[in-house]
Regions:
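Phosphate/NTP-binding elements of NTP-utilizing enzymes
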Residues: 1-174
């Protein structure tokens, strides 16, 4: 049983630890390995997709011998990457939550989720249900800190110890 059998994987590390790049490798490999799969990368802004995500993904494709126009296309108007095998990578932002719901997805990758509200994650998680594919969610970010919403998900016992208060009514005379 390896990481491929888990529904959700989290990649955390310090700045410049290549978390996004490692996750993009996973995004691209999934899209190539599973024809006609649909996945979504959620970034904070469209500018991040333009300056960071798209260049890194297309660089990976180029390094793997794939050619633009032959093996993949980038639609910069709709923020979608379509591969020759029918797979689609949707590029969406947390600043436009109205654009998040949509097609059923096989995989989901919120990048820098630390800066996103929990509602973004909970809004799009139910769409990871594309029939016939292994469903995966991988998140990449610098750590969110002890009080971040993600800690409730991945470290619930520790979160409860540190942050939940048990209120016990006082009895008279105590």
């Amino acid at each position: 049983r390896g990481p491929e059998s888990e529904l959700m994987l989290r990649v955390c590390g310090g700045r410049y630890a290549a978390k996004t790049y490692a996750s993009l490798i996973r995004d691209a490999k999934y899209a190539l390995y599973y024809p006609s799969s649909r996945g979504m990368i959620i970034s904070l802004t469209k500018a991040n997709h333009r300056s960071n995500i798209i260049p890194k993904l297309t660089g990976l494709f180029r390094d793997w011998g794939l050619r633009h126009g032959t093996h993949y296309d980038v639609n910069k108007n709709d923020y979608e990457i379509t591969l020759y095998n029918g797979s689609i990578i949707y590029l969406r932002t947390s600043q436009e939550p109205e654009n998040l719901p949509g097609p059923d997805l096989a995989w989901l990758h919120p990048d820098e989720y630390k800066s996103m509200p929990e509602s973004i994650f909970t809004q799009v998680l139910p769409t990871v249900r594309q029939y016939g594919y292994p469903h995966q969610v991988w998140l990449s970010s610098t750590p969110g800190g002890a009080a971040h919403w993600s800690r409730r998900i991945w470290q619930p016992d520790q979160y409860a110890i540190d942050f939940d208060l048990e209120v016990v009514p006082r009895r008279a005379g105590r």
